[in-house]
């Protein structure tokens, strides 16, 4: 393999960072992004304060700082126990950094060039492919999003039932 050619997964990770972090149109290289994008953007929104805290102690507005963030991605899988949750945390973190650098074109472009490579190495290409690659990640995200929607719907129906009970009790008390 030519050392100057990046693996397809790296280009796809760059696309995820662009679609999720920079709100660019979904990446043309892989049509499986929608559930992945929904998961990552939801995680970015829900855990924004956590990601902000992670960046608070790093001077990431430099190429050295961006490289430090990439090295920190490698630590996520340092114990050899990769799973989809960790993989998504890495992808979300890279997307969050891209978002934070969106108004600094040179640093953003540098981050989009190097962080996908770090993410690729952190997730581990063999691990990723052995678990179905992008289709496996899409299936995981779809499953988690479906469970979340199910819990939200259960909570919504429970709230509606409670409201109906209260309204019925109020109506009965007026008779």
Swiss-Prot record:
Annotated stretches, region: Mediates interaction with human NOP53 and localization to host nucleolus: 37-42
Superkingdom as given in the UniProt entry: Viruses
Gene3D superfamilies: Blc2-like
Name recorded for this polypeptide: Apoptosis regulator Bcl-2 homolog
SUBUNIT field: Interacts with human NOP53; may sequester ORF16 in host nucleolus and reduce its antiapoptotic activity. Interacts with ORF55.
Keywords on record: Host membrane, Host mitochondrion, Host nucleus, Host-virus interaction, Inhibition of host apoptosis by viral BCL2-like protein, Membrane, Modulation of host cell apoptosis by virus, Transmembrane, Transmembrane helix
Disulfide feature: none
Localization of this protein: Host membrane; Host mitochondrion; Host nucleus, Host nucleolus; Host nucleus
Protein task: Plays a role in the protection against apoptosis mediated by cytotoxic cells during the immune response to acute and persistent viral infection. Contributes therefore to latency establishment. Also plays a role in the inhibition of host starvation-induced autophagy which ultimately contributes to the viral chronic infection. Also participates in the viral genome replication within host nucleus.
Source organism of this protein record: Human herpesvirus 8 type P (isolate GK18)
Family: Belongs to the Bcl-2 family.
Membrane spanning stretches: 153-173
Recorded topology in the membrane: Single-pass membrane protein
Gene Ontology CC terms: host cell membrane; host cell mitochondrion; host cell nucleolus; membrane
GO BP term, example: symbiont-mediated suppression of host apoptosis
């Amino acid at each position: 393999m030519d050392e100057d050619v990046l693996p397809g997964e790296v280009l796809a990770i760059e696309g995820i960072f662009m679609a999720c972090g920079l709100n660019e149109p979904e990446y043309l290289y892989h049509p499986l992004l929608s559930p992945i994008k929904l998961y990552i953007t939801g995680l970015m929104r829900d855990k924004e304060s956590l990601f902000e805290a992670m960046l608070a102690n790093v001077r990431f507005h430099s190429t050295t700082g961006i490289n430090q963030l990439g090295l920190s991605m490698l630590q996520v899988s340092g114990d050899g126990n990769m799973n989809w949750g960790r993989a998504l945390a890495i992808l979300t973190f890279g997307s969050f950094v891209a978002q934070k650098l969106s108004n600094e074109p040179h640093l953003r472009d540098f981050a989009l060039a190097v962080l996908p490579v770090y993410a690729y190495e952190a997730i581990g290409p063999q691990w990723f492919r052995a678990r179905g690659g992008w289709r496996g990640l899409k299936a995981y995200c779809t499953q988690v999003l479906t469970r979340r929607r199910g819990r939200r719907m259960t909570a919504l129906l429970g709230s509606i039932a409670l409201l109906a009970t209260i309204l019925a009790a109020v109506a009965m008390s007026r008779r």
